[in-house]
Amino acid sequence: MEGQTPGSRGLPEKPHPATAAATLSSMGAVFILMKSALGAGLLNFPWAFSKAGGVVPAFLVELVSLVFLISGLVILGYAAAVSGQATYQGVVRGLCGPAIGKLCEACFLLNLLMISVAFLRVIGDQLEKLCDSLLSGTPPAPQPWYADQRFTLPLLSVLVILPLSAPREIAFQKYTSILGTLAACYLALVITVQYYLWPQGLVRESHPSLSPASWTSVFSVFPTICFGFQCHEAAVSIYCSMRKRSLSHWALVSVLSLLACCLIYSLTGVYGFLTFGTEVSADVLMSYPGNDMVIIVARVLFAVSIVTVYPIVLFLGRSVMQDFWRRSCLGGWGPSALADPSGLWVRMPLTILWVTVTLAMALFMPDLSEIVSIIGGISSFFIFIFPGLCLICAMGVEPIGPRVKCCLEVWGVVSVLVGTFIFGQSTAAAVWEMF
């Protein structure tokens, strides 16, 4: 029956998820996971530390979140092996049934679309600030047409982002992910060093707040952490592209990736907050003098970092549309080239459509800080709720001892409840701030 889960059929052993080519090395998987997590959220972490009321409460929230973040990645790898599916939405649909699968697809597509828009908006802002810095020596005058992000962002999208987004497999992104990870490391290093060197023109708060105003303010940073560390959407695709897919090996890859990300995020958050205190901007680079050459280089490299992570997000969003194409009647009409959704004649139009839609939205979108809470709230579905549901549903697939089974089911329930709380709290707070 359509409503049956794999657990009702019973599987003697874990099938390997179907994938075109398992060519990704362990180090490549680490870099892609890191790059998926090291996105625009890096700029928001000093602001999140300020909102939480200081270093200690924010760091504690980060450590608690890290437990669930790593757990979610491990669960997704296990669920992919059990279900035999090669995409996040396919795993959820295979284990939890078609109804939850459709909900996952809708949330997945919406979340990735908004993340892509946010990334393009960050790139556009950095390009605009970079142009302002380079033209700062000229008298005040209207901004030249070639410095307007309405020109620079579409040009960058056509010449750089679109070619990087064209490849069929996610394994290709391991090359650009190394460059993007190094760019994120440079940003963290700059913020740390700037705190100690204290360059001329830098003004910081003399006595930053070191205690939270309320528990509500502490909980309010969860969406920023979810937005920052979200790499779970890519987890299944990365796992299925790896040459070595044992669960213990995947757990090691997940732990190493998130610990490295935690170090980079923590350095950025701590020293950005200690430098500016409660006056820190939601985009920490905006708090630094615009004519500082070190900051100008950081802007360029961070824009490069976001450019390299955008294709990963596009790949995941495109996979949802390809699944829809495969299940619908669209693939059965016309030439045989259109029957394969991963083929060039289907893949490239979907890629161009995604870039065009997100670019149009980015050029008219409000300030990034206004939607981070919403994105972070939706991300809780993919970090907490769906992995928890997959773990609960997967318990009937393999023979497991009753005590271990009970413990894993309890952990799945806890994960779902925590994700539901974060989604409700962050969404309510975002709506409240809008009005």
UniProtKB/Swiss-Prot annotation:
Record InterPro entries: AA_transpt_TM (IPR013057)
Keywords: Amino-acid transport, Cell projection, Cytoplasm, Disease variant, Membrane, Transmembrane, Transmembrane helix, Transport
Tissue: Expressed in fetal and adult brain, and spinal cord. In the brain, it is localized in the cell body and axon of the majority of neuronal cells and in a subset of glial cells. Found throughout the neuronal retina, with higher expression levels in the inner and outer plexiform layers and the photoreceptor layer. Very weak expression is also present in the kidneys, thymus, and testes.
Bilayer disposition of the protein: Multi-pass membrane protein
GO cellular component: axon; cell cortex; membrane
One of the protein's GO biological processes: neuron projection development
Transmembrane is among the record's keywords: yes
Spans through the membrane: 29-49, 55-75, 100-120, 151-171, 178-198, 218-240, 250-270, 295-315, 348-368, 374-394, 410-430
GO molecular function, one term: L-amino acid transmembrane transporter activity
Reactions listed under catalytic activity: L-glutamine(out) = L-glutamine(in); L-alanine(in) = L-alanine(out); L-histidine(out) = L-histidine(in); L-aspartate(out) = L-aspartate(in)
UniProt-annotated location(s): Membrane; Cytoplasm, Cell cortex; Cell projection, Axon
Primary role: Electrogenic sodium-dependent amino acid transporter with a preference for L-glutamine, L-alanine, L-histidine, L-aspartate and L-arginine. May facilitate glutamine uptake in both excitatory and inhibitory neurons. The transport mechanism and stoichiometry remain to be elucidated.
Disorder this protein is connected to according to its UniProt record: Foveal hypoplasia 2: An isolated form of foveal hypoplasia, a developmental defect of the eye defined as the lack of foveal depression with continuity of all neurosensory retinal layers in the presumed foveal area. Clinical features include absence of foveal pit on optical coherence tomography, absence of foveal hyperpigmentation, absence of foveal avascularity, absence of foveal and macular reflexes, decreased visual acuity, and nystagmus. Optic nerve misrouting and anterior segment dysgenesis are observed in some FVH2 patients.
Family per similarity comment: Belongs to the amino acid/polyamine transporter 2 family.
Protein name as annotated: Solute carrier family 38 member 8
Taxonomic classification: Eukaryota, Metazoa, Chordata, Craniata, Vertebrata
